[in-house]
UniProtKB/Swiss-Prot annotation:
Species classification: Bacteria, Pseudomonadati, Pseudomonadota, Gammaproteobacteria, Pasteurellales
Lineage top rank: taxon: Bacteria
Top EC class for this record: transferase
Family in the record: Belongs to the DsrE/TusD family.
GO terms under biological process: tRNA wobble position uridine thiolation
Disulphide-bridged cysteine pairs: none
Full protein name: Sulfurtransferase TusD homolog
Length: 126
C-alpha cells in the first residue's frame, strides 16, 4: 500500500513525532511505500538543522534522514509553517545567506501534500 504521513508534533517535547517515525519504519520494513512525509504546524521543527539533542537522547532528525536515504522517502516541510518558526533556506529567507534547513528535508506547499494524499491508499496524521 502507498502511505502519506503527516506529522504535526514537534521533534522534542511530545511523543507524536517519534511515534510517526516508528510507524514509518514499520511500514517500510513490511514492504509498504511511503510517498511523502509532510511536516506541518509544530512538526516543521524536525527539519531545523540547529536541533542539538543531548548525547544520550535519540536523535529523531538523524533517524528521519536515514529513513529518507535508505528508503527514498521524501521529507517535506510546510513552507508557511517553517517560515513562521524560523526554518528557512536561501530561497525563502530574507537574505540568500540564511539556511537552517536540515539535509534530506525540502520545503513544500500544501498543494504537494494534497496531491500526494489523493494518490495514496492511506493518509495517517500524527
Amino acid at each position: 500500500m502507498r502511505y502519506v504521513l503527516c506529522v504535526k508534533q514537534p521533534a522534542y517535547g511530545k511523543q507524536g513525532g517519534f511515534l510517526a517515525y516508528q510507524l514509518a519504519k514499520a511500514l517500510l520494513e513490511k514492504g509498504h511505500q511511503i510517498t511523502q512525509v509532510f511536516f506541518f504546524q509544530e512538526g516543521v521543527t524536525h527539519g531545523n538543522a540547529f536541533l542539538y539533542p543531548a548525547s544520550d537522547e535519540f536523535n529523531l532528525q538523524h533517524a528521519w534522514q536515514r529513513l529518507a536515504q535508505d528508503y527514498h522517502v521524501p521529507l517535506h516541510l510546510c513552507v508557511a509553517a517553517a517560515q513562521r518558526r524560523g526554518v528557512v533556506e536561501p530561497l525563502t529567507s530574507s537574505t540568500t545567506q540564511q539556511n537552517n534547513l536540515a539535509s534530506c528535508f525540502v520545503l513544500a506547499g500544501l498543494g504537494e501534500f494534497m496531491k500526494a494524499s489523493l494518490e495514496a491508499d492511506r493518509v495517517v496524521c500524527l
